[in-house]
Amino acid sequence: TRAGRWRGHEKTECGIHLPASALAGDLRRTRVPLIKDGAYVEDAWLRIEGEAPLPSDGDVIVDWIRLKEEASLGHDRSGRLGVVFPNTEDANLLAPHLGRLALVALELPSFTDGRAFSQARVLRHQLGFSGELRATGNPKADQAAFLVRCGFDAFEVRGTQPLEVWQRMLASVSRVYQRGYSEGAGAVKS
């Protein structure tokens, strides 16, 4: 047996992984649980797949291809507009669209793929995006504090990590050497 490698079928003893049956009832209210401000919240946004028609009102999220191909998208309806932006694209491509976007969802396809962290920094620091910045795909609680430092303020949670783990991980970094998105100058914060 290698050290650090879980050998059992059920990973429930470590405190990070729980079976789906053990998840809190409020977690199951939305199709994809959403954590915002340290709590589960109901997702008010409707994700529109492909070329499906947009509803006349309500907040909608479209994919990047549709946003860039339809210049007037969202102008003839009430409700806010958001986009799912792939991590394979340069975040600067969103610059001409940011004035009409209230949400940008950045994809984290795997734990080892950090491109969305860089995109978030560009959106917040260089382009001045002030809307909701959502981590989608496969964000993990282990990344929570670092996602917030890059500017994320909402997380779609597809795994079985309970809210308590996310809250603990959000508070886990007590000293930092670089400024985060919403912090002032200073080399060390404690």
Language model regions located:
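Glycine-rich phosphate-binding active-site loops on the catalytic face of alpha/beta enzymes
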Residues: 152-170
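Glycine/Thr-rich beta-alpha phosphate-binding loop at enzyme active sites
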Residues: 80-123
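N-terminal, charge-rich interaction modules
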Residues: 15-19, 25-70
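Hydrophobic faces of well-ordered beta-strands that scaffold small-molecule active sites
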Residues: 60-62, 79-83, 102-106, 131-135, ...
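Active-site-adjacent beta->alpha loops and helix N-cap segments on the catalytic face
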Residues: 67-71, 111-122, 164-172
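Catalytic cores of alpha/beta
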Residues: 92-96, 140-153
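C-terminal helical cap(s) of enzyme catalytic domains, especially alpha/beta-barrels
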Residues: 164-189
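Glycine-rich beta-to-alpha transition loops that act as phosphate-gripper elements at the mouths
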Residues: 87, 130-141
